[in-house]
């Protein structure tokens, strides 16, 4: 998997998450976390929040390729979800240990964890699934130049939706 495909896919998946979160207020999907703390995350931290989301997905998939070097397609999806679940559980214990008020981002994550509970694991698994699937399809179908264009277009679009109310 090309890194440009992975980064571009993570950007577009985050764009989709933000569209659902920002443009569908009040639309509660029963098996996904509520959008309250997630909207606060994007509203308060803007592009830093977007960067953290995209980098989290990219690093998770890259770790999956390191630990499971022969994984591809559905195997890579499952490997990425495995890494993501480990990360989410570890990160949950980290945020519990950080006192309220010490880190603004961690404070929002605490609210998100309280609000979303186990549904966060499912939402993050869908993010990993989308990222791996899009990156894999792009690698199979498109040239490097076209993927680079899609990635830049995604970055450009993500900047604008980040500041949409």
Over which residues does each language-model region extend?
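Phosphate-/polyanion-interacting regions in eukaryotic proteins
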Residues: 122
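Juxtamembrane/disordered regions of integral membrane proteins
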Residues: 1-119, 129, 133-165
């Amino acid at each position: 998997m090309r890194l440009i495909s992975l980064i571009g896919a993570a950007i577009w998946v985050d764009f989709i998450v933000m569209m659902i979160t920002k443009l569908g207020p009040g639309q509660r999907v029963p098996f996904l976390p509520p959008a309250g703390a997630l909207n606060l995350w994007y509203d308060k931290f803007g592009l830093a929040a977007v960067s953290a989301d995209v980098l989290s997905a990219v690093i998770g998939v890259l770790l999956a390729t390191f630990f499971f070097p022969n994984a591809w397609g559905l195997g890579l999806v499952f490997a990425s979800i495995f890494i993501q679940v480990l990360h989410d559980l570890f990160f949950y214990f980290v945020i519990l240990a950080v006192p309220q008020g010490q880190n603004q981002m961690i404070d929002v994550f605490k609210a998100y964890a309280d609000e979303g509970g186990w549904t966060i694991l499912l939402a993050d698994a869908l993010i990993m699934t989308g990222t791996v699937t899009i990156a894999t399809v792009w690698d199979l179908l498109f040239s490097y130049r076209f993927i680079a264009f899609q990635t830049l277009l995604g970055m450009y679009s993500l900047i604008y939706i980040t500041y949409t109310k």
